[in-house]
């Protein structure tokens, strides 16, 4: 008997680099480890992340947007199998990728990644330190220090 079309969508693709769906999902989950890609998603596709464009913070329920529900379900599906060793072995940066997928399971994180200070905190301290640390708690200060350090490095390199 042939499998139902819905059943096939629920099963992860076989972990082979020759399977197109596997390589597509591998590329997508790998890109989620990049905080700037998360920012791109938040800015360009806020409806997928349950971000209210009107800026009304009181409306935190994304149940009204079927796109946000579908994307959250897709992220949960991806996390459910990419965290297994059979699939995680193909990730270039498994720690950062799986942490990003885990964080994206949270509604509040999906809504907060539109804020530049959240992205800078992730980029400056790494996703592995999202639970605390001075830079994550005060991202404006960390960003200023980082920019100053970059400018000093550029000045120093142009003098030599």
From Swiss-Prot:
Molecular-function GO term, any one: transcription coregulator activity
Localization terms from the record: Nucleus
Record region (Disordered): 124-160
* Main subcellular location of this protein, as a coarse class: nucleus
Q: Keywords assigned by UniProt?
A: Activator, Nucleus, Transcription, Transcription regulation
Q: Which Pfam families match?
A: Med31
Mind telling me which GO cellular component terms the entry cites?
mediator complex
Is-annotated flag, keyword Nucleus? yes
InterPro entries linked? Med31_sf, Mediator_Med31
Regions of biased composition (Polar residues) lie at 147-160
Q: Which domain of life is it from?
A: Eukaryota
- Note the Gene3D superfamilies from the entry: Mediator of RNA polymerase II, submodule Med31 (Soh1)
**Alphabetical GO biological process terms:** regulation of DNA-templated transcription
The Swiss-Prot or TrEMBL record describes its family as follows: Belongs to the Mediator complex subunit 31 family.
Q: How does it assemble?
A: Component of the Mediator complex.
Write out the function statement from the record: Component of the Mediator complex, a coactivator involved in the regulated transcription of nearly all RNA polymerase II-dependent genes. Mediator functions as a bridge to convey information from gene-specific regulatory proteins to the basal RNA polymerase II transcription machinery. Mediator is recruited to promoters by direct interactions with regulatory proteins and serves as a scaffold for the assembly of a functional preinitiation complex with RNA polymerase II and the general transcription factors.
Name of the protein in question = Mediator of RNA polymerase II transcription subunit 31
The source organism is: Aspergillus terreus (strain NIH 2624 / FGSC A1156)
């Amino acid at each position: 008997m042939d499998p139902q079309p819905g059943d096939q969508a629920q099963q992860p693709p076989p972990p082979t680099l020759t399977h197109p769906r596997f390589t597509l999902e591998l590329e997508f989950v790998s890109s989620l480890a990049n905080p700037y890609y998360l920012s791109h998603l938040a800015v360009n596709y806020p409806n997928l992340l349950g971000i209210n464009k009107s800026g009304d913070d009181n409306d935190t329920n994304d149940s009204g947007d079927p796109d946000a529900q579908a994307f959250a379900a897709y992220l949960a599906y991806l996390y459910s199998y990419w965290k297994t060793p059979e699939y995680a072995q193909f990730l270039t940066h498994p720690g950062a990728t799986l942490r990003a997928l885990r964080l994206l399971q949270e509604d509040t994180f999906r809504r907060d990644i539109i804020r530049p200070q959240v992205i800078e905190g992730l980029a400056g301290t790494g996703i592995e330190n999202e639970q605390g640390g001075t830079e994550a708690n005060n991202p404006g200060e960390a960003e200023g220090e980082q920019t100053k350090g970059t400018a000093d490095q550029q000045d120093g390199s142009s003098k030599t």
